[in-house]
Regions:
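Intrinsically disordered, Ser/Thr-rich regulatory regions of eukaryotic membrane-trafficking proteins
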Residues: 1-219
Length: 219
């Protein structure tokens, strides 16, 4: 009898590093501005960041304007973004897989096509845009609060923001960064309409109104 098990795609790591820091041997950890998961050993963090920096530097020899954007392996996908000069953000996700057991024999098939580079790149860009919306650019924060201040804000923001990213549910619609309408029956839609009209009538200084429920658009 055959049985199967599906493992969904997951966020494995997310980090921000500055290539201008930690240039001396033994100070490489200073490059890291933020790293998730935080419980990784320092050696592993430094090794992963160093590998990414080496990949970027190597690919710059072929295309200086657009160096390494994504790395594919059988089990992982890694995407790169340079939102500001010399500051890189890297996200690594697992490739979903299906395990089948038939007559005691176990086979695992990784579904590469399920993970799209463009979708992950959009998610990475959005993560930076959201930080910039609330705090300003990395450079501005660093100029105002210093490197440790930047690290603290990155930690505070991304430790919460990354919890909202469901990698397995990212799809082509994520690229357009749109918003879904909340389906309502006529009665509930009319109540929402009346509520918005009441608010706008009561507070005359309101010029535009957006009514959200969760992450869906009502009005």
């Amino acid at each position: 009898m055959a049985t199967s098990y599906v493992k969904e795609s997951e966020l494995l790591s997310f980090f921000v590093y500055d290539t201008r820091l930690g240039l001396k041997e033994g100070t490489e950890e200073q490059k890291i501005l933020y790293y998730h998961p935080d419980n990784e050993s320092v050696n592993k963090k430094v090794r992963n960041v160093g590998l990414c920096e080496a990949l970027v530097n190597f690919t710059k020899t072929f295309n200086p304007d657009r160096p390494c954007q994504a790395v594919h392996t059988d089990r992982k996908r890694q995407v790169f973004l340079e939102p500001e000069p010399e500051i890189w953000t890297v996200m690594t996700v697992s490739i979903p897989w299906v395990e089948q057991v038939n007559n005691g024999e176990r086979t695992v098939q990784y579904i590469q096509d399920y993970v799209q580079d463009e979708v992950l790149e959009t998610a990475l860009q959005r993560s930076y845009s959201m930080f910039k919306l609330f705090h300003g650019s990395y450079t501005d924060v660093c100029n105002q609060a210093g490197q440790e201040g930047l690290r603290a804000r990155l930690q505070r923001f991304y430790s919460r923001y990354l919890q909202t990213i469901d990698v397995d549910k990212l799809d082509i619609f994520s690229i357009f960064q749109g918003m879904q309408f909340l389906p309502l029956d006529k009665y509930m839609y009319l109540k929402a309409h009346c509520f918005v009209n009441l608010v706008e009538t009561t507070y005359r200084n309101i010029q535009r109104t957006v009514f959200l429920y969760g992450d869906q658009l009502v009005w």
